């Protein structure tokens, strides 16, 4: 089934707690994940909370990558939403799994904007002129 995008909703467990609390490193690894997926980075913003935790977003031309960390639990919640056929969110997922040193993960892939649900003919090109 064709869709406008793919959205990975990922749970990362037993991650490196120091990595999860390092805002500069998290931003660097999220941008690298976007790059490895084939995405085009538009902008990013990240924030470190006190006493610990990081939240951030990398806005890409093809949608976004987000992260929220709980270093005290070794846990990160990650969303990787990409549109188009040239970007692979699974490459971003694999990069982040390694970078955060996650020992366990759970991930679900959702099709966003399924052609059959919004009335786009299956043989339509992904990009259309409006």
From Swiss-Prot:
Keywords, ordered alphabetically: Autocatalytic cleavage, Decarboxylase, Lyase, Polyamine biosynthesis, Pyruvate, S-adenosyl-L-methionine, Schiff base, Spermidine biosynthesis, Zymogen
Pathway(s) per entry: Amine and polyamine biosynthesis; S-adenosylmethioninamine biosynthesis; S-adenosylmethioninamine from S-adenosyl-L-methionine: step 1/1
Active-site residues (renumbered): 63, 68, 83
Xref: InterPro entries: AdoMetDC_C, AdoMetDC_fam_prok, AdoMetDC_N, S-AdoMet_deCO2ase_core, S-AdoMet_deCOase_pro-enz
Reactions performed catalytically: S-adenosyl-L-methionine + H(+) = S-adenosyl 3-(methylsulfanyl)propylamine + CO2
Keyword Transmembrane listed: no
Recorded GO CC terms: cytosol
Example of a GO MF term: adenosylmethionine decarboxylase activity
Record site: Cleavage (non-hydrolytic): 62-63
GO biological process: spermidine biosynthetic process
EC primary class: lyase
Cross-referenced Pfam families: AdoMet_dc
Modified residues (Pyruvic acid (Ser)): 63
Family membership noted in the UniProt record: Belongs to the prokaryotic AdoMetDC family. Type 1 subfamily.
HAMAP family per record: AdoMetDC_1 (MF_00464)
Oligomeric form and interacting partners: Heterotetramer of two alpha and two beta chains arranged as a dimer of alpha/beta heterodimers.
Annotated protein name in UniProt: S-adenosylmethionine decarboxylase proenzyme
Organism: Thermotoga petrophila (strain ATCC BAA-488 / DSM 13995 / JCM 10881 / RKU-1)
Organismal lineage: Bacteria, Thermotogati, Thermotogota, Thermotogae, Thermotogales
Gene: speH
């Amino acid at each position: 089934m064709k869709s406008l995008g793919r959205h990975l909703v990922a749970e990362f467990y037993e991650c490196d707690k120091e990595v999860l609390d390092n805002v500069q490193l998290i931003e660097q690894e999220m941008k690298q994940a976007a790059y490895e997926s084939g995405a085009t980075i538009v902008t990013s913003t990240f924030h470190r909370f006190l006493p610990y935790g990081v939240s951030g977003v990398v806005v890409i031309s093809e949608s976004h990558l987000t992260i929220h960390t709980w270093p005290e639990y070794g846990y990160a919640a990650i969303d990787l939403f990409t549109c188009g056929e040239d970007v692979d969110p699974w490459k971003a997922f694999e990069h982040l799994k390694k970078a955060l040193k996650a020992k366990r993960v759970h991930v679900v892939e959702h099709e966003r904007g399924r052609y059959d649900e919004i009335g786009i003919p299956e043989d339509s090109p992904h990009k259309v002129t409006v």
